[in-house]
């Protein structure tokens, strides 16, 4: 967030749950820090699970704080950002470990396409809360710390007797294989920086336009270098990213799902300061042939553009 813009909500809340063994427990903020702030001067709502408090697990007040926050975000028409680092449901307590999570899922779905919902994983996201990132518009993961799974390596080993590493469920796995992850940051700081960049391409809600940025490039600049990038021989592959860099403002292209179905490129850019969604064939990968993963990637991206009033620009070179 921009400096000195965070306003916390529900800071005085503590856990209302009781352990099964009857012992009392202390959970400041019930393991969730929520509130509003600004990113580049625009208001956003932020939810962060606190792993130092009962592993960031989901308790009743924890869930209620999020539910109230996303309802406020939808009413105000501002983006909702998650910072997740959670062990999932609060096991060992008398109240239902996943109390309120059905309401949580319902509100994520209800407000999908109305306000941008961005989930940022910078630690484990396990069990019931692992569904939440998949319901958001975008998921960003830290390569060093993020893991997304329902059970994890130990549960998988107990069920199948198969030993697997922590890389299963990590950022690279969900980028390359499942396609769940949209953007990978090298570490927490890099992931947060990319989240701010992503927000700069999105409107505050479905009723507004994306933010305009004054370009430093001349709109009539010479792009004849494209002729040296695109070969005359149709059978010769090339990297479409080079063409994109020549066309967009300030060579600034923010790619979505770069490691998934790489024969199709999707991402955000600006033309003369206006935000566009860009979809392009990439002849350098599999001859840019469109298959099922590429179709899923395209369709999901198109849904976001349609919801948030972002024009689509398509570069086609495919068999």
Indicate residue ranges for each PLM-predicted region.
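A short, charged helix-loop
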Residues: 155-157
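Terminal-region recognition feature
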Residues: 1-118, 124, 129-131, 135-151, ...
């Amino acid at each position: 967030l921009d400096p000195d813009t965070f306003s916390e909500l529900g800071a005085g809340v503590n856990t209302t749950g009781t352990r099964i063994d009857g012992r009392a427990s202390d959970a400041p903020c019930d393991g969730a820090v929520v509130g509003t702030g600004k990113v580049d001067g625009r208001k956003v709502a932020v939810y962060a699970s606190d792993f130092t408090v009962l592993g960031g697990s989901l308790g009743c007040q924890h869930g209620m704080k999020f539910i109230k926050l996303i309802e406020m975000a939808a009413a105000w028409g501002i983006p909702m950002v998650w910072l997740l680092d959670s062990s999932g449901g609060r096991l060992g307590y008398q109240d239902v470990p996943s109390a309120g999570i059905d309401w949580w899922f319902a509100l994520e779905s209800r407000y999908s396409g109305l306000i941008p919902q961005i989930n940022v994983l910078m630690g484990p996201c396990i069990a019931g809360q692992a569904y939440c990132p998949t319901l958001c518009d975008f998921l960003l993961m830290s390569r060093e710390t993020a893991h997304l799974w329902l059970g994890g390596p130990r549960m998988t080993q107990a069920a199948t007797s198969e030993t697997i590493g922590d890389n299963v469920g990590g950022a690279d796995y969900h980028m390359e294989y499942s396609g769940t992850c949209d953007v990978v940051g090298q570490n927490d700081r890099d992931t947060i920086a990319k989240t701010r960049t992503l927000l700069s391409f999105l409107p505050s809600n479905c009723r507004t336009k994306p933010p305009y940025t004054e370009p430093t490039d001349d709109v009539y600049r010479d792009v004849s270098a494209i002729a040296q990038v695109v070969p005359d021989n149709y059978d010769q592959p090339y990297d479409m990213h080079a063409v994109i860099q020549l066309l967009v403002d300030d060579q600034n292209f923010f790619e979505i799902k770069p490691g998934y179905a790489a024969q199709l490129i999707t991402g955000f850019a600006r033309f003369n300061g206006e935000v566009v969604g860009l979809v392009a064939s990439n002849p350098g990968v599999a001859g840019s042939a469109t298959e099922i993963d590429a179709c899923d990637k395209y369709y999901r991206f198109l849904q976001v553009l349609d919801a948030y009033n972002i024009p689509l620009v398509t570069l086609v070179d495919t068999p």
